[in-house]
Amino acid sequence: MTPHREYIAPAQLDWQGAQPVSTQFDDIYFSADGEQEVQRIFLQPSRVVERASATERPWFTIAELGFGSGLNFSVSADEIVGKTDKILHFISIEANPLTPKDWRKVAALRPHSVTAQALAESPLPLLTGWHRRSMHQGRVQLSVFHGDVEDGLGDLADFQQQPVDAWFLDGF
């Protein structure tokens, strides 16, 4: 576990219209059809809603590397809350988190998303270590590790007592 928290450098974004682009990695955070892309690339192939509905446990856990703008999280939360009676625990690791200003811009692009609005209202701090949020009256639990992926995965391996039901691995 991270013994103390330190400041972590935020993502450096260049907003090209409604599209955030990482100046560090010269890569977009999401495409114009980002929500449909999450459905197509992550949710449908991994049958998240079907598998969450079928599990006997009261929760379903998704983990990913790279929280970015939280789009995968937001779309997953909307699907789980809207189509099942399960609690979603979403775990992510992020090396360069968004600034509060960027969270507000993301939320403005997704006014219909409860999770995007919640992250804009209470952004994750620019500090290393684990940060947690509860949303949708406790039906969505978010755990994000800010820092090096090896440190985050090490902590996860040491302390995550429940299985991860689905992993979202991006090609970044």
How should these model regions be labeled?
Residues S69-S74:
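Glycine-rich SAM-binding Motif I of class I
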Residues R104-F159:
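S-adenosyl-L-methionine
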Residues D165-F172:
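A short SAM/SAH-binding and catalytic strip from SAM-dependent methyltransferases
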Residues E79, Q160-Q161:
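Short, solvent-exposed amphipathic alpha-helical segments in soluble enzyme
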Residues M1-A63, A77-V114, A118, G138-V140:
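Rossmann-like AdoMet
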Residues G66:
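Conserved glycine-centered beta->alpha loop in an early N-terminal alpha/beta scaffold
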Residues P97-L98, V149-D151, F172:
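Short acidic/polar capping segments at secondary-structure boundaries
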Residues W59, P163-V164:
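Local beta-strand N-terminus motif with an aromatic residue
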